[in-house]
Amino acid sequence: MKFSLSAAVLAFAVSVAALPQHDVNAAGNGVGNKGNANVRFPVPDDITVKQATEKCGDQAQLSCCNKATYAGDVTDIDEGILAGTLKNLIGGGSGTEGLGLFNQCSKLDLQIPVIGIPIQALVNQKCKQNIACCQNSPSDASGSLIGLGLPCIALGSIL
């Protein structure tokens, strides 16, 4: 019994040692080895704050958001009486990818040129989290017929 337990422990140790090594500094690098791992819709590196603000339009403001919820874009069709029940209970199924909705956002302002020298700050340098376009008015769906309030939408999803 002691021999088989020792052999099992030794076999486990050898198999763990044989696994390929991963980069230790790769945690949280996100899409393309850049930024936060929660950024599903990255913004291209050459987009400036001014260009991003123009893309959001005059009814929304450019924001940097900490929290993201993704839904839409994926539809699963399950067949049978209990098909997909477990998957939907644990968070899989329809709505696992797609449109990014954000909260805990702070506004990204355009820099005012100092002494006539325009500053073209890149949006990815100003915000390392989720970059989004947020409504200027507070999101409140209580008086709405549909009852839907979309406070912020990922900038990368509309580019």
From Swiss-Prot:
Keywords: Cell wall biogenesis/degradation, Conidiation, Disulfide bond, Secreted, Signal, Sporulation, Virulence. SMART domains: HYDRO. It is found in: Secreted; Spore wall. This is Class I hydrophobin 1. The gene is rodA. Self-assembles to form functional amyloid fibrils called rodlets. Self-assembly into fibrillar rodlets occurs spontaneously at hydrophobic:hydrophilic interfaces and the rodlets further associate laterally to form amphipathic monolayers. Disulfide bonds join C56-C133, C64-C127, C65-C105, C134-C152. Belongs to the fungal hydrophobin family. Residues 1-18 form the signal peptide. It comes from Aspergillus fumigatus (strain ATCC MYA-4609 / CBS 101355 / FGSC A1100 / Af293) (Neosartorya fumigata). Induction: Expression is significantly down-regulated by the anti-fungal phenylpropanoid isoeugenol. GO terms for molecular function: structural constituent of cell wall. Aerial growth, conidiation, and dispersal of filamentous fungi in the environment rely upon a capability of their secreting small amphipathic proteins called hydrophobins (HPBs) with low sequence identity. Class I can self-assemble into an outermost layer of rodlet bundles on aerial cell surfaces, conferring cellular hydrophobicity that supports fungal growth, development and dispersal; whereas Class II form highly ordered films at water-air interfaces through intermolecular interactions but contribute nothing to the rodlet structure. Its main location: secreted. The lineage of its organism: Eukaryota, Fungi, Dikarya, Ascomycota, Pezizomycotina.
